[in-house]
Amino acid sequence: MPRPKILKRATVQPSAAVPVKKSTPEKEGSRQKKTNGKENASRNLQSNLEEDLEQLGFEDETVSMAQSAIENYFMQGKSASERMNNAKSRRGRRAGNGNTEEIEEDDEISNAITDFTKCDLPGLRNYITKKDNTEFEKRLEHLADNDFGKWKLYLAAGFNILLHGVGSKRDVLTEFENELSDYTYMRVDARKDGLNVKVLLGAINENMKLNCNVKRGQSTISWARSIRRKMNSQQLILIIDNIEAPDWRSDQEAFCELLENRDSVKLIATVDHIYSTFIWNSRQLSSLSFVHITINTFEIPLQELMTGDSRLLGLDARSNQSSHTMSSLDVFWKSLAVNSQKLFRLFFQMYFDTKKPVKFWDLFNAAKDDFIASTDAALRTQLVEFKDHRVLKWTRGDDGNDQLSGIVELRLVTEFLESKNMPLDEKKDE
């Protein structure tokens, strides 16, 4: 057997040596110092980075824990409602399978969620009204002694004042009214139902006796311009709470037109929303000439809460009592059949007599006695229409049965039914 050939590695001929540049001892020392400096800097950077990472990790953990706690508190209504809707959908799918145990379990979950998301609004109101305000009264007195004079100077110089900050500022404006007792002023609550820029223009025209009524087909901007021209020889100070209210956002151009004459119409207003200034563009902000003043009262905004859209308090748009007026109820009434109109009166009679949610089967028995509905299915059909028009809302009681709560205030319902010759019966004293 022939021996395999062993291949030898080729040797490379050494090339000509490249002469190495010799450095002086001074350069060697400086180079070594630079190297040591870089190593020290890298060590310091690494140690600082490790410390920052440790602190960052601790801060992130703290922030995440705080955020989760805040979200669990303030977002509980939303998450609970979503879970309740999911439970209802599961209950509907399982009803066809006849699985009664799962249905009962879902009912218990929905009942627990409903109880968890309930908010005792009367109790909340009583707590806020009984709160000790001595500290706030001292701050308000200090504000009146030191700042109210400056505010009047701002108004006299042709500027408008915009108050913002944490807490309700209604009492601040109420106290400032005392400083304006020698002037002509008008206080407006922009959150009040039915109040907007057009209503404000009508009130100015009537109270200032301008005789500048709106013409047929005249725009709000043109009407505001006419009122401004009529007020050349008069002066008015507008005090507006929550000028960023939804009904005021669309007519800000007309409002700016009214304030164009700074010698005649002056403004001091409050805002609460963090993005409230976005309702004005840059040109409008320039014409309004706001002096922004921060006032942190830290007072609970009771009126703002009750007229707002807080889902946590159950005052969202679907249950807000200020969402109905006489005209809206009249339109809804005309769309109802005669039996549905009788049911409307019967439900609110039972609801306002007991001042508690009306159980569905109690309402059905009463409706059956009055020949309004012969079956529970017919009654549910009528009540669904009431719910769609935000007249009542469905909840589930402690016993698992459906119950109904009215979301239109007593004064409005009483006045409306009297106009329809179907007044509510007065509750007899026991």
Curated annotation (Swiss-Prot):
Single GO MF descriptor: DNA replication origin binding
Lineage summary: Eukaryota, Metazoa, Ecdysozoa, Nematoda, Chromadorea
Keyword Ligase: no
Cellular location(s): Nucleus
InterPro entries assigned to the protein according to its UniProt record, in alphabetical order: ORC2 (IPR007220), RecA-like_ORC2 (IPR056772), WHD_ORC2 (IPR056773)
Chain intervals for the UniProt region annotation (Disordered): 1-49, 80-105
UniProt keyword Phosphoprotein present: no
Known partners and oligomeric status: ORC is composed of six subunits.
Span of the signal peptide: none
Name under which the protein is recorded: Origin recognition complex subunit 2
Family indicated by similarity: Belongs to the ORC2 family.
A GO BP annotation: DNA replication
Compositionally skewed regions (Basic and acidic residues) per UniProt: 23-41
